[in-house]
UniProtKB/Swiss-Prot annotation:
Keywords, ordered alphabetically: Oxidoreductase, tRNA processing
Enzyme class of the recorded protein, top EC level: oxidoreductase
Lineage: Bacteria, Pseudomonadati, Pseudomonadota, Alphaproteobacteria, Rickettsiales
Annotated protein name in UniProt: tRNA uridine(34) hydroxylase
Catalysis: reaction(s): uridine(34) in tRNA + AH2 + O2 = 5-hydroxyuridine(34) in tRNA + A + H2O
Membership in a protein family: Belongs to the TrhO family.
Matching PANTHER family: RHODANESE-LIKE DOMAIN-CONTAINING PROTEIN 7-RELATED, THIOSULFATE SULFURTRANSFERASE/RHODANESE-LIKE DOMAIN-CONTAINING PROTEIN 2
């Protein structure tokens, strides 16, 4: 039986002074280790998802951590029968997840994590609203039953939605959700920076939630859109046929 392909996703908000200098080093080790996927680098940190053998994706992650020196890294691994990526790309970006808000400090302002095992209980409490920070085409594939969708085409539209919906958010305990954790973490940072106090987010995102809970309480409906060749995954994180969506 052939070895399963490991898919490792990792991000960290950490100051990187010269991110462009890291590109050739990461490309070199990634190609040597037959790893495929995408790593985004910016002054605010890194965000990557790449596939290969379990040993090799972890070696690439170790190099990434060594080069950037973060205090905390959000990491998750799941498995596939085939590579979900075609090749390795390392790209320089202005932001590792583009929101277009100048001066946002995610280390200084961010919400409180809710562990996947505690998520169902938390979001069914009084005065809690769930905001799905993903784009409309992702939400159409699947979301939490109680979630509110901002109906954005891109994450850059999210700050404007927040500005227009202050009445909806005022006085609420706001629970943010996204695919792997990075967008909801940055979303909580935005809300905290403009004065919202009770802001929370699902640790590890929807993918970690499905892995840890298997959607046992059926609060999640549909499949989870992913940005690789699988396109969408079911409760058990297996690819879902028929969700070859355009984006």
């Amino acid at each position: 039986m052939s070895e399963k392909i490991a898919i490792l996703s990792a991000y960290s908000f950490v100051n990187i002074e010269e991110p462009a200098n890291l590109i050739p080093k990461l490309l070199l080790i990634g190609k040597r280790k037959y790893v495929r996927g995408t790593i985004l680098l910016a002054n605010e940190g890194f965000n990557g998802s790449f596939s290969g053998s379990y040993e090799n994706v972890n070696l690439v992650l170790e190099e990434l951590i060594k080069l950037t020196g973060p205090k905390d890294v959000n990491v998750k691994i799941n498995y596939s029968d085939v590579h979900p990526f075609q090749k390795l790309k390392v790209r320089l970006k202005k932001e590792i997840v583009a929101m277009n808000v100048e001066g946002l400090n995610v280390d200084l302002f961010k919400g409180e994590y809710i562990e996947p095992k505690d998520w169902d209980e938390f979001i069914t409490k009084q005065n809690v609203i769930v905001i799905d920070t993903r784009n409309d085409y992702e939400v159409e594939v699947g979301t939490f039953k109680s979630a509110i969708s901002p109906n954005t085409k891109t994450f850059k539209q999210f700050p404007a939605w927040v500005q227009k919906n202050q009445g909806l958010l005022k006085g609420k305990r706001i629970a943010m959700v996204c695919t792997g954790g990075i967008r909801c973490e940055k979303s909580t940072s935005l809300l905290k920076s403009i004065g919202y106090d009770e802001v929370y987010h699902l640790k590890g995102g929807i993918l970690q939630y499905l892995e840890d809970t298997q959607n046992k309480n059926n609060l999640w409906q549909g499949a989870c859109f992913v940005f690789d060749d699988r396109r969408a995954v079911a409760d058990d994180l297996s690819p879902v046929a028929g969700h070859w969506l355009q984006r």
